[in-house]
């Protein structure tokens, strides 16, 4: 979903999201510039009949339901959204939790310092899989962000080059090689005589 509004504006997004249980990305655009991206993970709900009284129990799986409740008066409440991450990082796949962390760090609207540390730690601990996922999805801005944050990690860089070559994503391979060369040039210049 693309919204031409600021993330702090009142929108009807909560009502739209309440009708969609599959994973959905919301991109906020203002003046032709992406100002925020928010991932709402998939969730499922099942009603179990408790017989014979015909009482139903509601079971919800996935953090997507809780994420869709993070609104305050029609505005996205990102502080509340940040509270779902500890459970989401344990229950959701690395790809999904990685996107949540990546988007919150790339677009830090209302991002508290403790949440920033939590998201950064998650990226650091799962960086190879997350950058691989970004390459498979051909998300160049996210690849750039990961390279800027972890350009000193040779293992991640080498792994990213392999994944970019395997997927045939030449733009990513060129970008990663550029970051690697820049890092090597910095090392060489330190020891030049």
Put a short name on every predicted segment.
Residues 7-9, 152-153, 167:
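Short acidic, S/G/P-rich loop/turn micro-motifs used as interaction or catalytic elements
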Residues 110-127, 150-159, 171, 180-193:
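Ankyrin repeat arrays, specifically the small/polar loop and inter-repeat linker segments at the C-terminal end
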Residues 14-17, 161, 173, 177:
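Short amphipathic alpha-helical segments and helix-helix/interface helices
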Residues 133-139, 163-169:
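Ankyrin repeat A-helix N-terminal signature
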Residues 138, 142-150, 155-162:
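C-terminal structured domain segments
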Residues 1-138, 144-147:
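Solvent-exposed loop and capping/linker segments of extracellular ligand-binding repeat ectodomains
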Residues 139-147, 169-181:
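Ankyrin repeat structural motif
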């Amino acid at each position: 979903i693309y919204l031409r509004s600021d993330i702090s504006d009142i929108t009807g997004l909560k009502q739209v999201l309440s009708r969609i249980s599959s994973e959905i990305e919301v991109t906020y655009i203002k003046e032709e510039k992406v100002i925020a991206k928010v991932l709402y993970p998939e969730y499922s709900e099942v009603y179990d009949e408790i017989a014979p009284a015909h009482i139903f129990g509601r079971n919800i799986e996935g953090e997507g339901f809780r994420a869709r409740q993070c609104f305050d008066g029609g505005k996205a409440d990102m502080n509340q959204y940040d509270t779902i991450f500890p459970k989401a990082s344990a229950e959701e796949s690395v790809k999904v939790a990685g996107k949540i962390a990546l988007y919150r760090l790339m677009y830090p609207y209302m991002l508290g310092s403790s949440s920033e540390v939590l998201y950064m730690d998650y990226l650091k601990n799962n960086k190879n899989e997350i950058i691989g996922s970004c390459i498979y999805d051909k998300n160049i801005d996210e690849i750039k962000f990961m390279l800027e944050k972890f350009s000193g990690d040779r293992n991640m860089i080498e792994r990213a080059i392999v994944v970019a070559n395997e997927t045939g994503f030449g733009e990513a391979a060129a970008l990663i090689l550029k970051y690697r060369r820049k890092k090597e040039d910095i090392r060489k210049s330190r020891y030049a005589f």
